Swiss-Prot record:
Pathway: Purine metabolism; IMP biosynthesis via de novo pathway; 5-amino-1-(5-phospho-D-ribosyl)imidazole-4-carboxamide from 5-amino-1-(5-phospho-D-ribosyl)imidazole-4-carboxylate: step 1/2. Belongs to the SAICAR synthetase family. Pfam families: SAICAR_synt. Gene3D superfamilies: ATP-grasp fold, B domain (3.30.470.20), Phosphorylase Kinase, domain 1 (3.30.200.20). GO terms for biological process: 'de novo' IMP biosynthetic process; cobalamin biosynthetic process. This is Phosphoribosylaminoimidazole-succinocarboxamide synthase. Keywords: ATP-binding, Ligase, Nucleotide-binding, Purine biosynthesis. It catalyses: 5-amino-1-(5-phospho-D-ribosyl)imidazole-4-carboxylate + L-aspartate + ATP = (2S)-2-[5-amino-1-(5-phospho-beta-D-ribosyl)imidazole-4-carboxamido]succinate + ADP + phosphate + 2 H(+). The gene is purC. Its EC number is 6.3.2.6.
Amino acid sequence: MQKLELLYEGKAKRIYRTESADMVWVEYKDSATAFNGEKKETITGKGRLNNEITTLLFRKLQEVGIKTHFVEKLSETEQLVKKVSIIPLEVVTRNVIAGSLSKRLGMEEGTVLAEPIVEFYFKDDDLGDPLVTEDHIRVLNVASPEQVSVLRDMALQINQVLIDHFASCRVRLVDFKLEFGVTEEGEIILADEISPDTCRLWDETSNEKFDKDVFRRDLGNLTDAYEEILKRLGGISHV
C-alpha cells in the first residue's frame, strides 16, 4: 500500500489517500492541544504512543466482534484504516464525574456514576463542539434517530469492554470520546482513535491521571503518563 497525497490534517493526525479507494493512511502527529486549540505544544513521542495504544485497543475491540475502521499498523506513527464518512458527532461516555460534567452538574470530581451517561457533541470547531440533545441532532440533520440509537448502543458496548480491559491493568476508565463513520455499504463502524488523548484514565488506587489532563492542567510529563498506559496494556514502552 502506498501513501499518496494529503487529504486532511487535523489537530492530532494527517490523513492521506492510498491507491485503494476504500483505504486511507493515517499518520499520528506529535502535537498536543487543549481547550479547542487555545493551548498548543509539540511533544516528541506523543504520536507514536497514541498510535501504539489505539492499535492495541482497536484490536481488543475487534477480538470481541466490534467493527472498527482499523486495518493494520504500518509504522510507529502510522496505520491503515478503512475509508468512512465520519458522522459529525462526538459520542462521550462517562462512568465517573470529571471535567466539564463536574462543572455542569455541580458534582464533585471522582463521584462514581450508578450507570454510564452517554452524551453527544456536535463536531464544529467554530461553535466549540457544543453538547447537543437528540432533538438538536434531528434539527441539524447529521444523523437519523436510528443511527443515534446505534451510536448509543455501540458506545455502551465499547464502554463495558474497555472498563473490564483497563480494570485488568489497574486503570479506571473515567470517561472517553468516540467517533464513528459510515461505510460505503451504509454500516456504522468505530473510527478515529482510542488513546489517552480521548480518554480519562486514572490509576485505580491513587487516582493519578494518565491522560491529556496532564497537559491540560500542567500535572507533569505527558509522555511519561502515556508510556505508563502503554506499559500496563502490554505494549512496548520506550522509556
